[in-house]
Amino acid sequence: MKYFEKRFLDVYRPIYLGVIFLGIVLDLVTKFLVILYFQPHRYLEVFGSFFRMTLTFNTGFVFGAFQDNAIPSLIATGVAIVFLIGYRWKNHDLGNPWGWNLVMAGAFGNFLDKFFVKIPGTGFRFGFQPNMGEYIGVVDFLDFDWPDFLLFSRWPAFNVADSCVTIGLTILIFTMKLEEEK
């Protein structure tokens, strides 16, 4: 018995690959624009103090945990992407494909972003090198203030790729739960 019952393009149809590509492009373009027009840790209020755009760099993992661990973060993200591709291919009928597409777009967007050195005012330069007055890490810029009853006053800044992963996982959790109940 073959491990993968379906061909790759039967599971990852061209329309799905197009959505993944579109998500990656949207993520990287927004990050590029923020790099060009914002200075690190200076913000622009969009909806008062509730929603601001603030350029930050995450050199760690989720929510900025374990900062200055760019290489382990890059490796972990790469392993997760390979796992997700294989898992989705093997379990092609599990969950909503659009949820998978969004998770993949976000994972690839942040993975690619980890390979670029960011230079405020000039944009991106390809290469993974030590920080020499430049910025290495994932660009985060969507900055929300939440009610004071939460453990922190501002949610950690995030980006379009993070939004894709969150929305995609939410879709997958709900659709898998519905499939389980049937």
UniProtKB/Swiss-Prot annotation:
Question: What do the Gene Ontology cellular component annotations say?
Answer: plasma membrane
Q: Which UniProt keywords apply?
A: Aspartyl protease, Cell inner membrane, Cell membrane, Hydrolase, Membrane, Protease, Transmembrane, Transmembrane helix
The reactions it catalyses are: Release of signal peptides from bacterial membrane prolipoproteins. Hydrolyzes -Xaa-Yaa-Zaa-|-(S,diacylglyceryl)Cys-, in which Xaa is hydrophobic (preferably Leu), and Yaa (Ala or Ser) and Zaa (Gly or Ala) have small, neutral side chains
The superkingdom listed in its UniProt entry is Bacteria
Q: Which Pfam families is this protein grouped with? A: Peptidase_A8
Biological processes annotated in GO:
proteolysis
List the InterPro entries hit by this protein, alphabetically.
Peptidase_A8
Please give the function described in this protein's UniProt entry.
This protein specifically catalyzes the removal of signal peptides from prolipoproteins.
Q: What is this protein called?
A: Lipoprotein signal peptidase
Name of the gene this protein is made from: lspA
